[in-house]
Amino acid sequence: MNDWLFDLGNSRFKCASLREGVIGPVTVLPYLTETMDAFALQELPRGRVAYLASVAAPAITTHVLEVLKIHFEQVQVAATVAACAGVRIAYAHPERFGVDRFLALLGSYGEGNVLVVGVGTALTIDLLAANGCHLGGRISASPTLMRQALHARAEQLPLSGGNYLEFAEDTEDALVSGCNGAAVALIERSLYEAHQRLDQSVRLLLHGGGVASLLPWLGDVVHRPTLVLDGLAIWAAVAANV
């Protein structure tokens, strides 16, 4: 039986098989709320070992774990540690560093100096030097969360829609231009500072469900949609040999 990798985020739930270190095709599963969809959970794959990375609410994580423990002989939950597989985290308290960010760094190690950007509910930015040293990062709201926050405080502002323009002439266009533009500007600023700090070339790696709307404005970028799962596979290999 195969092992399986599960990436449970704040808004997306993905899985992929893992066989002899090779990740299979990625499946996007129905996202689960705290009320849970029992049928969707029962449709989760079965296998030998399940490796779970979760940044979801505790109630959702608990429900998913309960089902995985039925479907698998063993369940292991990924957690951030100070050093793993060549990567050393900058945080003085590594447990405060999100496991999704941690795994994305594991997945990108070995590709030189990289600025790793995750676009989901939050926008996360982390600088990883070629020697595996994490040099810190930033957390901001993603464009989607910015739109949601604005709509929550002013219902007349739409949640979606609009086209990116540098100087928009209607509200929908102004919203997408402002929110996406803020994210692009933060990424560009971080990339500039990364070059200044390292005095070397730095690759820009993007992952996460909200990446598509930013890609056209970021120039030379590598899109790595499976980066967290790639890192989880590395973490699984380390865990299996402990």
UniProtKB/Swiss-Prot annotation:
Keywords: ATP-binding, Coenzyme A biosynthesis, Cytoplasm, Kinase, Nucleotide-binding, Potassium, Transferase
Annotated transmembrane regions: none
InterPro entries: ATPase_NBD, Type_III_PanK
Record's keyword annotation contains Mitochondrion: no
Active site per UniProt: 100 (proton acceptor)
UniProt binding sites for substrate: 91, 98-101, 171
A single Gene Ontology CC term: cytoplasm
Cofactor binding summary note: A monovalent cation. Ammonium or potassium.
Domain of life: Bacteria
Cofactor entry: NH4(+); K(+)
Entries under CDD domains matching the protein: ASKHA_NBD_PanK-III
Any one Gene Ontology BP term: coenzyme A biosynthetic process
Location relative to the cell: Cytoplasm
Catalyzed chemical reaction(s): (R)-pantothenate + ATP = (R)-4'-phosphopantothenate + ADP + H(+)
Coiled coil: none
Pathway: Cofactor biosynthesis; coenzyme A biosynthesis; CoA from (R)-pantothenate: step 1/5
Principal place of residence: cytoplasm
GO MF, one example: pantothenate kinase activity
Keyword check for Transferase: yes
Subunit structure: Homodimer.
Family: Belongs to the type III pantothenate kinase family.
Entry function: Catalyzes the phosphorylation of pantothenate (Pan), the first step in CoA biosynthesis.
Name the UniProt record assigns to this protein: Type III pantothenate kinase
Organism, as annotated: Xylella fastidiosa (strain 9a5c)
